Curated annotation (Swiss-Prot):
Lineage per the UniProt record: Eukaryota, Metazoa, Chordata, Craniata, Vertebrata
Extracellular side: 242-253, 302-336, 392-451, 521-525
Gene name as annotated: Slc12a3
UniProt-reported outcome of changing R900C: Does not affect protein processing and glycosylation
Sugar-bearing residue positions: N404, N424
Subcellular location: Cell membrane; Apical cell membrane
Gene3D superfamilies documented for this protein: Amino acid/polyamine transporter I
Domain of life (superkingdom): Eukaryota
Consequence of substituting A224T: Does not affect protein processing and glycosylation
Identification of the protein by name: Solute carrier family 12 member 3
Effect of disrupting the coding gene: Simultaneous knockout of APOE and SLC12A3 results lower plasma Mg(2+) compared to plasma levels in wild-type and APOE knockout animals. Simultaneous knockdown of APOE and SLC12A3 shows no significant differences in aortic root atherosclerotic lesion intima area and thoracic-abdominal aorta lipid deposition as compared to APOE and double APOE and IL18R1 knockout animals. In contrast, simultaneous knockdown of APOE, SLC12A3 and IL18R1 results in significantly smaller aortic root intimal size and decreased thoracic-abdominal aorta lipid deposition.
């Protein structure tokens, strides 16, 4: 714990207790009312510090709900725990800061306060302006049951029972329920893995799988619900139209009657929605009661003895032989098959997302969604099984409906179960002309019921409740999608109104879509696509649960435990299979739309971070493959140039970053290293902000690289840390890339000594080394500070982006003067594979003797062909060993003159002291020992000017200065001489003298 100094108390504040804890801020806290000797003085009510930290004098705090919530409670400032710096670093006596950390007038709201919601809070006393919130029964179970029940229950389930038989019908029901139950378990797991806000299915998928899949599903799910409003409304309108025609009172004509009734109905539903969720919920309860009454009416009807009219239509109340006959299938018609019946029934098992879609209007979504959804699935399944079994026990498959078809004495045979009940339907049964019976009459439930109009009312309730649920779901899901701004031009519809933040604009948009499809009246074509959109949602919900489980992320901790990742995977696969079983072409369209929207979001790359399981999966894959690389032994064929680039802040040297990323992009590792020089205590607070900003800059520039920074006392020690600690396992840098130090002649000699020391350290650590020089320089920050003219700034901008543009039909000149293992050849080969450098011609220059030029050229060409690099143009330099021109030699001598010791006539003690104080200076002995190397660099600079003045890039072997024998100033003079007069960028490369190229296949 971080201890606070105890301020002295005035004498009159002292009590008789043995221990006394003073207040943190002296007069800022109220003094104790009195000293009570019956308890230690540090337990008095005046010490709020005790309430927080068990009486210890510390700013550390106990666990509290508010420390983990995203926002504060309404009307109260947000509480935060002390930072690590507050606890660990030197404590400053800043009264306001300490008081904010330690003093809490609420006397320690601790972990038990987690019962209070942090944003949509549900306090025990409801405030006047508090939004309406629903429990699991009214908010989820009833809503899901109403959305699951539909016209198929009333008009198609008896027919499916007649076709498939009771046994296979139960199998169809249970298979459908298995899919929805697995999805319900997945929803329950996802919805209990953290606080769920508004947005329903879209929110669950997007926060689990990320914005890419979540955004695409959210958009099509909202659209599917909007069209679902039209589908259910048209179902209601068709029933009303049939009633009008039955009583001879049509409005206009059959098609326009549907349009008129549909538009009027959806307008009424819109008005209910706009009235608020409270009124919408009351309407749903009313519809639920109507359906319950219709069910009771049906069950009572099955118990009433059949009238003559009902008997003529095939109803004879419960009989065992009818039940036995209807156990087995009797396939008829085009759809007469198991999968045909399954495809017709399955949509009636969907609708389980209705409760989750209003997650923002639930009191406790984590409790309401699992309990309400699973209970809705259970009770609707019971209702389907019960209706299938009861109606299959009461009604025969074929009946004429003619009351005159009673049994009469005569020679004609009588076939079928009806014969045993005094009815002869043999003729219509043989001719397949029966109009009634379980397999022929869709209104069988109405016929069986005690009062047929109540079944019609049930159909009305089922269709209207489903339409209302779809209208609310479409608007709520779309509102959340708009707020996340994953797609353009939709933010207008995200605004909420009133205490419940009702999506009024979303309601109006869903209303417009519904009216459009009602007027089009071509729902038979669009309905299969909509069904597949819902199945896409089921598949992705199940996959979300599976993926979150399989990644083993510590953040996946659902409080609902009754799920299985393998069951979720099965649910995802079977949902896709069912899509194709229902309508294969609609499945292809649905998947195509999802992929299109997915690719759009991937292309746009929205700046959101929801901690998705995709991110966790990426980490798992990266970790698994990184560990797996440890088992792979190094091989020349698998060599990759993995670069540690000393960029400092990457945006200071954009050209260097661009150049290296050209040959490492999608190929190998690139780390941008940054050494922050200074005392660690002062620089540590900068690290996190600096790293985040530079990583964003790399991402914005589309550079696939890592950023790594260290704090060190000087550059050299910092780079040593980077070279030893950067990377992971086999993914460690093997090349150090640095920019050329242009100001070496005017800079402090110690910095030059550090710079050359970095190169020596790289060779000691078995790194290859690349030194990059551009005539304009690499550090744009210097240019921004020194240049003031617009022309100069434009030139710097062009130089900083030179490697982002195509290099044209110039040349890449490689001076492969010394064999370093092949790195000098490999890097230009990798560059040439990129589009920007693909048009450049590569020329290879090697040293040689004038009398053996052809032989040496052929030998190098043969070697290059074995390397399969595609380099065919080779030039031998026979004059490389000639003496340089005198003027160039003189310029080199003038360059090193300020750095010479001139120790020829000085005593040994003086020379030793000078060398100790100025190790970068060059003695006369070192001049003489390195004279041949120095002249070689001068001569090579002349050759570079002769051959490569107009090249796009010059690559040559980096000379090596022996440690202790070549002072830093002399080595810098070599590099300066090689590159100072060249217009093209120059890259000096020296590998670690190990092979990186091979012509063997193993």
């Amino acid at each position: 714990m971080a201890e606070l100094p105890v301020t002295e108390l005035p004498g009159d504040a002292l009590c008789s207790g043995r221990f006394t804890i003073s207040t943190l801020m002296g007069g800022d806290e109220p003094p104790p009312a009195a000293c009570d000797s019956s308890q230690p003085s540090h337990l008095t009510h005046g010490s709020t510090l005790y309430m927080r930290t068990f009486g210890y004098n510390t700013i550390d705090v106990v666990p509290a709900y508010e420390h983990y919530a995203n926002s504060a409670l309404p009307g109260e400032p947000r509480k935060v725990r002390p930072t690590l710096a507050d606890l660990h670093s030197f404590l400053k006596q800043e009264g306001s800061h300490l008081h904010a950390l330690a003093f809490d007038g609420r006397q320690g709201r601790e972990l038990t306060d987690g019962l209070v919601e942090d944003e949509t809070g549900t306090n025990s006393e409801k405030s006047p302006g508090e939004p309406v919130r629903f429990g699991w029964v009214k908010g989820v179970m009833i809503r899901c049951m109403l959305n699951i029940w539909g016209v198929i229950l009333y008009l198609r389930l008896p027919w499916i029972t007649a076709q498939a038989g009771i046994v296979l019908t139960w199998l169809i029901i249970l298979l459908s329920v298995m899919v929805t139950s697995i999805t319900g378990l997945s929803i329950s797991a996802i919805s209990t893995n953290g606080k769920v806000k508004s947005g329903g299915t879209y929110f669950l998928i997007s926060r689990s799988l990320g914005p890419e899949l979540g955004g695409s599903i959210g958009l099509i799910f909202a659209f599917a619900n909007a069209v679902g409003v039209a589908m259910h409304t048209v179902g209601f309108a068709e029933t009303v139209r049939d009633l009008l025609q039955e009583y001879g009172t049509p409005i206009v004509d059959p098609i326009n009657d549907i349009r008129i009734i549909g538009v009027v109905t959806v307008t009424v539903l819109l008005a209910i929605s706009l009235a608020g969720m409270e009124w919408e919920s009351k309407a749903q309860v009313l519809f639920f009661l109507v359906i319950m009454v219709s069910f009771a009416n049906y069950l009572v009807g099955t118990l009433i003895p059949a009238s003559e009219d009902k008997a003529s239509k095939g109803f004879y109340s419960y009989h065992g032989d009818i039940f036995v006959q209807n156990l087995v299938p009797d396939w008829r018609g085009i759809d007469g098959s198991f999968f045909g019946m399954f495809s017709i029934f399955f949509p009636s098992a969907t609708g389980i997302l209705a409760g989750a879609n209003i997650s923002g209007d639930l009191k406790d979504p984590a409790v309401a969604i699992p309990k309400g959804t699973l209970m809705a699935i259970f009770w609707t399944t019971i209702s389907y099984l019960a209706i299938s079994a009861t109606i299959g026990s009461c009604v025969v498959r074929d009946a004429s409906g003619d009351v005159n078809d009673t049994m009469t004495p005569g020679p004609g045979p009588c076939e079928g179960l009806a014969c045993g009940y005094g009815w002869n339907f043999t003729e219509c049964s043989q001719q397949r002309s029966c109009r009634y019976g379980l397999i022929n009459y869709y209104q069988t439930m109405s016929m069986v019921s005690a009062f047929a109009p109540l079944i019609t009312a049930g159909i009305f309730g089922a269709t209207l409740s489903s339409a209302l649920a779809c209208l609310v779901s479409a608007a709520k899901v779309f509102q959340c999608l708009c707020e996340d701004q994953l797609y353009p031009l939709i933010g207008f519809f995200g605004k909420g109104y009133g205490k419940n933040r009702e999506p009024v604009r979303g309601y109006l948009l869903a209303y417009a879509i519904a009216v459009a499809f009602i007027i089009i009246a071509e729902l038979n074509t669009i309905a299969p696509i909509i069904s597949n959109f819902f199945l896409c949602s089921y598949a992705l919900i199940n996959f979300s649960c599976f993926h979150a489980s399989i990644t083993n992320s510590p953040g996946w901790r659902p409080s609902f435990r009754y799920y299985s990742k393998w069951a979720a995977l099965f649910g995802a696969v079977i949902s896709v299979v069912i899509m194709f079983l229902l309508t294969w072409w609609a499945a292809l369209i649905a998947i195509g739309v999802v992929l299109f929207l997915l690719l759009y979001v991937i292309y746009k790359k929205p700046e959101v971070n929801w901690g998705s399981s995709v991110q966790a999966g990426s980490y798992n894959l990266a970790l698994s493959y990184s560990v797996g690389l440890n088992e792979v032994e190094d091989h020349i064929k698998n060599y990759r140039p993995q670069c540690l680039v000393l960029t400092g802040p990457p945006n200071f040297r954009p050209a260097l970053v661009d150049f290296v990323s050209t040959f490492t992009q999608n190929l190998s590792l690139m780390i941008c290293g940054h050494v922050l020089i200074g005392p660690g205590k002062q620089r540590v607070p900068e690290l996190r902000l600096i790293a985040s900003g530079h990583t964003k800059w790399l991402n914005k520039r589309k550079i696939k690289a890592f950023y790594s920074d260290v704090i060190a006392e000087d550059l050299r020690s910092g780079v040593q840390i980077l070279m030893q600690a950067s990377g992971l396992g086999r993914m460690k840098p093997n090349i150090l890339v640095v920019g050329f130090k242009r100001n070496w002649q005017s800079a402090h000699p110690a910095t030059v000594e550090d710079y050359i020391g970095v190169l020596h350290d790289a060779f000691d650590f078995n790194y290859g080394v690349c030194v990059m020089r551009m005539r304009e320089g690499l550090n744009v920050s210097e240019a921004l500070q020194t240049h003031t003219t617009p022309e100069a700034l434009i030139q710097e901008e062009q130089a900083s982006t030179i490697f982002q543009s195509e290099q044209g039909k110039k040349t890449i000149d490689i001076y492969w003067l010394f064999d370093d293992g092949g790195l000098t050849l490999l890097i230009p080969y990798l560059l040439h594979r990129k589009k920007r450098w693909g048009k450049c011609k590569i020329r290879v220059f090697v040293g040689g003797q004038i009398n053996r030029m052809d032989e040496e050229r052929k030998a190098i060409i043969s070697l290059l062909s074995k390397f399969r690099l595609g380099f065919h143009e080779v030039h031998v330099l026979p004059d490389i060993n000639q003496k340089p021109q005198a003027e160039h030699t003189k310029r080199f001598e003038d360059m090193i003159a300020p750095f010479r010791l001139n120790d020829g006539f000085k005593d040994e003690a003086t020379v030793t002291e000078m060398r100790r104080d100025c190790p970068w200076k060059i003695s006369d002995e070192e001049i003489n020992k390195n004279r041949i190397k120095s002249l070689r660099q001068v001569r090579l600079s002349e050759i570079l000017l002769d051959y490569s003045r107009d090249a796009a890039l010059i690559i040559l072997t980096l000379p090596i200065g022996r440690k202790g024998k070549c002072p830093s100033s002399l080595y810098m003079a070599w590099l300066e001489t090689l590159s100072q007069d060249l217009r093209p960028p120059v890259l000096l490369i020296r590998g670690n003298q190990e092979n990186v190229l091979t012509f063997y296949c193993q």
